[in-house]
A protein has these predicted regions:
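C-terminal motif of bacterial Sec signal peptides marking the signal peptidase cleavage site
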Residues: 15-17
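Solvent-exposed coil/turn segments that connect beta secondary-structure elements
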Residues: 42, 197-199, 212-218, 226-231, ...
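C-terminal outer-membrane beta-barrel translocator/porin domains of Gram-negative envelope proteins
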Residues: 340, 344, 425-429, 544-729, ...
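Strand-loop-strand
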Residues: 424-425, 442-444, 489, 753-780, ...
């Protein structure tokens, strides 16, 4: 060790003595970052005069619209009176506040974009910062020492450990201030300007850059007129005027102009105008008539093609389907307005599948949403390796043509797919063991886009270290299981199967079985059936409804030792006894659009078990409150479970983000059950929860279990509350780091004499486990490898140590987790 230090310390000192500017070319300077950006002539909150004028402009614009609507019979003449009323004092103050807030938001948006243009990290930047860097610039030292090396070793060192210096000329501040100035103009700051200074440091070969931003007054939209559109298109624009992105009084923004072009294009295509494009909308702006304001005219360009001015209707559908890319489509099948060309004796994908997948209807107007749904439904089947969808005018020579034929060219994907997975585990309770799984899937199993998957899996675990007694493992366990899944790319239900939905839908039928063996304790078999329906009408909203789910858990054999454990814990006995779980559930998931800067996700899940079965018993004359009702000779579970989860990620800059999660859940057993099944209860701890503590090692409430090796079986609850926050930063290349804070616990809804302090009360909410820690992540694009070190700060029960930090020994509060994927 001493020899290693004797070698390592001089090496570090030698590198530290190296100059970071040794290899800087003559006339160049090493870029060391930017100073804090200075802002002058920042826009201030609107004065009363400005608010008055804008209010008048808005009122006049509204009045003009009202008069136009009255003349066209779209509204009553009485509306003219309300349109002519001036703003009262209360409304005036409200308008002032709105404009002041809007001005702050406008400047904040422009400021963010300008800073993004000016940002450029120096060598060894701290988390991608443009102003701060680490003092140990090893990459630069290596580059300076080996930049002119001609030997193989020197070149290898330079390639793998060297970092080229970032020069001021490479940063190109002149170009950046021009782009930043143009960015200000794009956001309505027409008089804005960005300048810079080169700040040479003590070492003349080093320099920082100081940027100065003069924002000036933001120009706002005055009157906005949509002119020269054909009458039919003008009516469409008026009918959707509430969705306009350009509004009087708001800041002029090129971004908003572009978004309005896109909105008009989508609106027209949704109403049949297939050939209308965003580029066909143009703007005329006048900034002279009223200083500080922009009078805007929105109109179509005169050079647009004539076919863009009329709606188009769907005609026939032509599908060209090949099994392989080089196949010749020598067979033809006609079904009404559908024509299918394919290779082979049978069409690989049945005609009915195409009719269900294509949302367009012959004779109806082309709609953009139908095109998007068609692409999504065909793609969701996963049976095609290639697909091209195009719309062809039926009569290109006729100026009055209005019919589009849909033409699809597609190539089938390979039929079979297999997946083999192998993993090794090392758990905090000293259980280790391997696990393997193999899944074989057949696509397009019945020529209807179906997917049939058969999966087998197995695992083996044994207790090590303190768990071993006399050379024999205290707990040997193995598990064998299988699952058969049938997925249909549509609803499969009586009376619904033949209907054509204009939205993507799936149906999953699952049959599964699982056999668990815990040597010296029990053998259990679990079997299940499930029918689940999924659909979404919008890409951001997902629905999943399980209409039927029946699980059966049966203990095949038990030992006297296990019987004693269950006798000491009645709740554990109820949750692990032989029982049926007939259930239904619904899950709603929302995910923000990908264009949103700060992404967020939320999910609500509700599940009930045994209620329908109990109603059937009630119809047969048995009381709803009667306990120990049986299904096929075994009791069935009754409970209601609800969970809610919200996740949000705030992107602070390109290399730094703040992720958060809040989770709440409750499960309430009733009727035939005193406790919910063990698998339905909540727990905290582990790699994706409170990372300072292992799985099922906290709670419920302030209950502290005995030191029994199996006490983790007691540490589940009926209620779970948890919150997590994590600061994520990109370190080097694909290597990322994180620091986190986790808090939460589980509680019982009912008192339990065997677990004092476990019940949820107003005072027990303060019994929260708290942990912090740090970790690294290696992002391989297709997979994220994660290693976290959790550090306990507070346990929810009393310990031998007083104070908020009540971890008896520091090492007792350390949790190590190796996992795949992000925790949330």
């Amino acid at each position: 060790m001493k020899r290693l230090l004797l070698f390592f310390l001089p090496a570090v000192l030698l590198l530290a003595a190296c100059s970071t500017t040794k290899a800087i070319p003559e006339g160049e300077q090493l870029y060391t970052g930017i100073d804090e950006i200075t802002y002058t002539e920042r826009p201030t909150a609107s004065t009363k005069k400005q608010a008055d004028s804008t209010g008048v402009i808005t009122a006049v614009a509204d009045a003009v619209t009202t008069v136009s609507d009255v003349l066209q019979g779209k509204t009553k003449a009485e509306s003219l009176l309300s349109a002519s009323k001036p703003l009262d004092e209360k409304a005036q103050k409200k308008e002032e506040k709105r404009l002041a807030k809007q001005m702050e938001e406008d400047f904040a948006t422009a400021k963010e974009e300008v800073e993004a243009v000016l940002a450029y990290p120096p060598n060894n930047a701290i988390f991608g910062s443009s102003s701060m860097s680490w003092p140990w610039k090893v990459g630069l030292w290596v580059h300076n020492g080996f930049a002119h090396s001609k030997g193989k070793f020197g070149k290898w060192i330079l390639k793998h450990f060297g970092t080229s210096p970032v020069l001021v000329s490479q940063v190109s501040p002149e170009m950046r201030v021009k782009v930043a100035t143009n960015t200000l103009h794009n956001y309505g700051f027409f008089r804005g300007k960005v300048t810079y200074d080169i700040l040479t440091q003590k070492n003349p070969k080093k320099a920082r850059i100081a940027y100065h931003v003069r924002a000036g007054k933001v120009y706002r939209l005055d009157s906005i007129a949509y002119l020269n559109y054909p009458s039919a298109m003008d009516s469409i624009l008026r009918a959707h005027s509430a969705a306009r992105l350009l509004k009087s009084g708001e800041a002029f923004s090129v971004v908003n102009l572009s978004d309005e072009q896109t909105r008009i294009e989508k609106l027209m295509k949704e109403n049949g105008y297939y050939f209308y494009k965003a580029a066909y909308t143009t703007f005329r702006a006048d900034t002279i008539m009223r200083p500080g304001f922009v009078q805007l005219q929105v109109q179509p360009i005169a050079s647009r093609p004539k076919e863009a001015d009329r709606p188009w209707y769907i005609g026939n559908v032509h599908v060209h389907l090949r099994r392989n890319e080089n196949d010749v489509t020598d067979k033809t099948l006609r079904r009404r307005r559908y024509t299918y060309s394919f290779s082979g004796d049978k069409m690989p994908l049945r005609a009915s599948v195409w009719r269900h997948a294509i949302a367009h209807r012959s004779g109806e107007k082309y709609r953009l949403s139908d095109y998007q749904t068609t692409m999504e439904k065909i793609g969701a089947m996963g049976v095609l390796s290639q697909m091209d969808l195009s719309y062809v005018p039926r009569d290109t020579s006729a100026l009055a043509g209005d019919t589009l034929d849909l033409v699809i060219h597609a190539v089938m994907d390979k039929l079979f797919d297999s997946t083999f997975e192998m993993n090794a585990t090392f758990k905090s309770n000293q259980q280790v063991g391997p696990g393997v799984s193999y899944e074989l899937s057949k696509r397009n199993a019945f020529r209807g886009g179906e997917k049939v998957s058969f999966k087998i899996f197995g695992s083996y675990e044994w207790q090590t270290g303190a768990g071993a007694e006399g050379g024999n493992s205290l707990l040997n366990s193995y598990e064998l299981g299988t699952a058969l899944t049938f997925r249909f790319p549509r609803f499969v239900f009586p009376g619904v199967s033949r209907r054509r939905q204009r939205f993507p839908a799936t149906t999953d039928f699952v049959i599964d079985a699982d056999w668990k063996n815990r040597s010296g304790f029990f053998q259990m078999v679990s079997m299940g059936l499930e029918a689940t329906y999924g659909w979404h009408k919008r890409a951001t909203r997902q629905h999943k409804l399980t209409l039927f789910s029946l699980d059966f858990d049966r203990l095949l054999t038990t030992t006297s030792n296990f019987e004693k454990i269950m006798a000491d814990n009645p709740a554990l006995y109820v949750s692990m006894r032989n029982q049926f779980i007939p259930a239904m559930s619904y899950t709603y998931t929302y995910q923000s659009p990908s264009t949103r800067r700060d992404a967020w996700w939320m999910q609500f899940h509700v599940k009930e078990a045994g209620h329908v079965t109990s109603l059937i018993y009630a119809a047969a004359g048995k009381s709803l409150s009667q306990r120990d009702k049986e299904l096929f000779g075994n009791p069935f579970a009754q409970f209601v479970k609800f969970t809610a989860e919200h996740r949000r990620t705030f992107r602070l800059n390109q290399s730094l983000s703040l992720a958060s999660r809040v989770f709440a859940g409750v499960v309430c057993s009733y009727g035939n059950s005193q406790a919910a099944p063990y698998a339905e209860q909540f727990y905290v701890g582990g790699a994706n929860s409170i990372r300072a503590f292992t799985v099922r090692s906290i709670g419920p409430g302030s209950y502290k279990p005995s030191s029994s090796r199996y006490s983790y079986m007691d540490q589940t609850g009926d209620v779970r509350l948890e919150a997590n926050v994590e600061l994520r930063a990109r370190l080097i290349g694909d290597l990322c780091g994180a620091v986190f804070l986790d808090a939460g616990n589980v509680w019982l809804l009912r008192p339990d004499a065997n677990r004092p302090g476990a019940q949820l009360t107003a005072s027990s909410l303060r019994h929260i486990a708290l942990g912090t820690g740090a970790g690294i992540r290696y992002d391989l694009d297709f997979i994220v490898l994660r290693f976290d070190v959790g550090i306990g700060l507070h346990m929810p029960y009393h310990t031998e140590k007083s104070g908020f930090y009540n971890i008896p020994r520091f090492k007792d509060g350390i949790g190590l987790h190796f996992a795949i994927g992000y925790p949330f």
